[in-house]
Amino acid sequence: MEDFVRQCFNPMIVELAEKAMKEYGEDPKIETNKFAAICTHLEVCFMYSDFHFIDERGESIIVESGDPNALLKHRFEIIEGRDRIMAWTVVNSICNTTGVEKPKFLPDLYDYKENRFIEIGVTRREVHIYYLEKANKIKSEKTHIHIFSFTGEEMATKADYTLDEESRARIKTRLFTIRQEMASRSLWDSFVSPKEAKRQLKKNLRLQELCASLPTKVSHRTSPALKTLEPM
């Protein structure tokens, strides 16, 4: 699964997911299903925001090619993917500027057109079950919830889907592609089934313990290939 994640997702998304997991003391090499889930969620958040701007009249517009006009403002503020301190700083700044109620939990996005925070969900289960779980956790009518599934289903607060149909279709297509790619590598079943995922996690832990017991020769040189991946 780890190899699939690194091949399937943009390196920036992979790096953000790794940082997020390490912030909570989790290892992407062991909890590979969680690694894949975080990368998927991050990509959906970025796709949700892509190409959406607000013009000088306050209207929402889509700009898909070239540099957007200087007068245009990004419609969505992306909160997901930031470290917790920076994320809360952004949330507090938005609340102070707009007067919206501060959420109890970190949301994923802020919509400057509708003036509301958005919680994005990506589920391998039934969308309505995951939606209810999110709603029960957040317990706030002010935070908008939008759930996507790998089967093309979606559910949103008051059936308000925020984005146009084409933008949502792009997200659904990407999720379906991820599912197909996982299935072709025999990874989908363990990604969906908690029982199978637990078995895979134990296998990863055993492999790590085995590798740790082997004698190793440490090299302090950085390969040319790895140098290209180092942050600037």
Curated annotation (Swiss-Prot):
Its EC number is 3.1.-.-. Plays a major role in the shutoff of the host protein expression by cleaving mRNAs probably via an endonuclease activity. This host shutoff allows the virus to escape from the host antiviral response. Hijacks host RNA splicing machinery to selectively target host RNAs containing introns for destruction. This may explain the preferential degradation of RNAs that have undergone co- or post-transcriptional processing. Keywords: Decay of host mRNAs by virus, Eukaryotic host gene expression shutoff by virus, Host cytoplasm, Host gene expression shutoff by virus, Host mRNA suppression by virus, Host nucleus, Host-virus interaction, Hydrolase, Viral immunoevasion. Its main location: host cell. The record marks 195, 198-199 as: Important for efficient shutoff activity and nuclear localization. This is Protein PA-X. Signal peptide: none annotated. It comes from Influenza A virus (strain swl A/California/04/2009 H1N1). Changing residue 134 to A: Complete loss of shutoff activity. It is an enzyme of class 3 (hydrolase). Belongs to the influenza viruses PA-X family. The probable endonuclease active site in the N-terminus and the basic amino acid cluster in the C-terminus are important for the shutoff activity. The C-terminus acts as a nuclear localization signal. The C-terminus is recruited to host protein complexes involved in nuclear Pol II RNA processing. It is found in: Host cytoplasm; Host nucleus. Disulfide bonds: none annotated. The record marks 202-203, 206 as: Important for efficient shutoff activity. The keyword Nucleotide-binding does not apply. The keyword Hydrolase applies.
